[in-house]
Amino acid sequence: MTTFTVIIPARFASSRLPGKPLADIAGKPMIRHVWEKARRSGASRVVVATDNEQVKNAVLQFGGEVCMTSEKHNSGTERLAEVVEKLDIADDEIIVNIQGDEPLIPPVIVQQVAANLAKYRVNMASLAVKIEDVQELFNPNAVKVLTDQAGYVLYFSRAAIPWNRDEFADIAANTKNLDDLRLGDHYLRHIGIYAYRAGFIKRYVQWQPTALEKIESLEQLRVLWYGERIHVELAEEVPAVGVDTPEDLEKVRSILTAF
């Protein structure tokens, strides 16, 4: 079994849902649900990275490990790099990044993404699921990923990729309904879970932001821009909704209180 460390970035400030990591779900703060899922994945170590004392105290109260980080990071990856440096994690250690707003993340895919990284000997790996809903394909909030035949990423985009010239042209011209489209297996939605080598995280944050990542607002495009490879597999289990809005929070509460 692959050995790996999970780091969970947990920001208290959120424009749409302030205090999100501490939101109560079935009698526990959300961050505890995420931490418990990470523990069940078989990770050798689980660390919550936060810039907030309230989150820190909550994690310590339920027995978790915390690393306090700067409030000035521009991205979650910068926060990971600070944790790697502070905890003196070896460069070859596999780090899995789970967002602190994913209380329903299946433990099996946490282990899967770590194994994916180890198997393909790349510096970064991730997961995807097939897109079966046509509306999702054209939703810019659903990030699409295009790979080669071996699963190495060609591009990430908020647009519908690959663009079906004949089918999609009719939609653009309003001569065909979205519901009449039939999607092939090559349309994939990216899942925001990553595995990296610790040394690669330190190298990544030294790179300057790129034009493509700014246009798409997708940080992972920086990796492709600088010539590194990312491997993506189909997730063994499709993760449920994360928590971005008060409405998402209510959905997750209803799911977890049902058990």
From Swiss-Prot:
Its EC number is 2.7.7.38. CDD domains: CMP-KDO-Synthetase (cd02517). Pathway: Nucleotide-sugar biosynthesis; CMP-3-deoxy-D-manno-octulosonate biosynthesis; CMP-3-deoxy-D-manno-octulosonate from 3-deoxy-D-manno-octulosonate and CTP: step 1/1; Bacterial outer membrane biogenesis; lipopolysaccharide biosynthesis. It comes from the Bacteria. InterPro entries: Cytidylyl_trans, KdsB, Nucleotide-diphossugar_trans. It catalyses: 3-deoxy-alpha-D-manno-oct-2-ulosonate + CTP = CMP-3-deoxy-beta-D-manno-octulosonate + diphosphate. One of its GO terms (cellular component) is cytosol. One of its GO terms (molecular function) is 3-deoxy-manno-octulosonate cytidylyltransferase activity. Its main location: cytoplasm. Keywords: Cytoplasm, Lipopolysaccharide biosynthesis, Nucleotidyltransferase, Transferase. It is found in: Cytoplasm. GO terms for biological process: CMP-keto-3-deoxy-D-manno-octulosonic acid biosynthetic process; lipopolysaccharide biosynthetic process. It holds the Pfam family CTP_transf_3. PANTHER family: 3-DEOXY-MANNO-OCTULOSONATE CYTIDYLYLTRANSFERASE, 3-DEOXY-MANNO-OCTULOSONATE CYTIDYLYLTRANSFERASE, MITOCHONDRIAL. Activates KDO (a required 8-carbon sugar) for incorporation into bacterial lipopolysaccharide in Gram-negative bacteria. Belongs to the KdsB family. HAMAP family: KdsB. This is 3-deoxy-manno-octulosonate cytidylyltransferase. It comes from Actinobacillus succinogenes (strain ATCC 55618 / DSM 22257 / CCUG 43843 / 130Z).
